[in-house]
Amino acid sequence: MKRIAVDTAKLERSYGIIFMGRDSRAHMFYGSPEQMAFDAQPGLVTTQNAGILSLFTTYVEPEVIEILVRPTKAAELYGETKKGTWVSDTIAFIQAERTGSVSSYGDFSNDAMSDANIDFPQRQSYHYQTNTRWGEREIARAAEAKVDLANWKQRSSALAIEKYQNYAYLYGINGLQNYGGTNDPFLPAPIAPTLNWFQQTDPTAIFGDVLRIVQQAIAQGNGLVDTNTRFRMGMSPGNQSNFSKTNQFNYNVNDQIKKNFPNLTIVTVPEFAINGGGGVAGGTEFVQLIAEIPEGGKTVEAAFTEKMRAHAMVVKSSSWEQKKSAGTWGVVFYRPVLVAAMLG
């Protein structure tokens, strides 16, 4: 009987298998009536109650369900690098342009001259911060629920900095020479699509717009760009799904891109769906094509002074505080002429 009780208890605890009535004896009765009390029913001293505290019947799942946030993809599209330090306010780039002309030769002629023009375009940094604080009692209370509150607050501060860095990479900082990948004033104006990709069922028509934006980059490149150039195309995840539309001939845009532009890779950027994206009324889509040419170095880079600086922990009487900071230069386009875009 003892062995059966052990086995059934393990089945219930580990596997949720319950055998009711495994003990045939009724525990509320005794062996003989003489062992039972026949006293009169007493009155209650306590408040009448037929239940128990709800906490005894509440099961708390130990796994913490983290709320998901939109991914940060700007650094993947533009590339990312560190420039300067957290005390750097301005960054200057050295830009050299070769100039020259020729004339007909003459033994005593000094006509025509070759020269070089040196320029120093600049960008300004922007530094931002967030603070975290922990109380002794709040941490202890959270620990009763098996929640590591201190760790979650640290992760929140890191995420806040990462999200803002991504925002700065896309839109820059208003009032500073600090531009984003979508609004740098030196970028060529975007072209408009010929149709709404979400409403179009013919993949050949969608590929026609893809071809147009590649041709725009080729035209701007003035011979530096061709169909074999290494491209990165940024678009929203919803817009990318239009490339999977297939007709009765098993033709889709993804296959045509691989065939015609073998070095083109797609990076999805959620923020490129403007006002809900092209799939909703009033929404638009932004598509950006970046050409990288080996002889020209990098076309664009997202730059930061520091990804995150964790400042000293401040100890209070019964709490702690910590500041975290970071700095950004936004996105720097070294050769904006190699960037084409489509908006609509």
Residue ranges of predicted features:
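Sequence/fold signature of self-assembling virion shell proteins
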Residues: 1-74, 244-344
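Assembly/oligomerization interface modules of large self-assembling protein complexes
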Residues: 46-130
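Short, flexible beta-strand-to-coil junctions
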Residues: 70, 74, 95-98, 226-229, ...
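Alpha-helical scaffold segments that mediate packing/assembly in large oligomeric complexes
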Residues: 129-212
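Helix N-cap / beta->alpha transition motif
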Residues: 135, 234-238, 335
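Residue-level signal for secondary-structure boundary elements
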Residues: 165, 169, 222-226, 265-269
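Extended, solvent-exposed, turn-rich assembly/linker loops in the middle of proteins
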Residues: 182-253
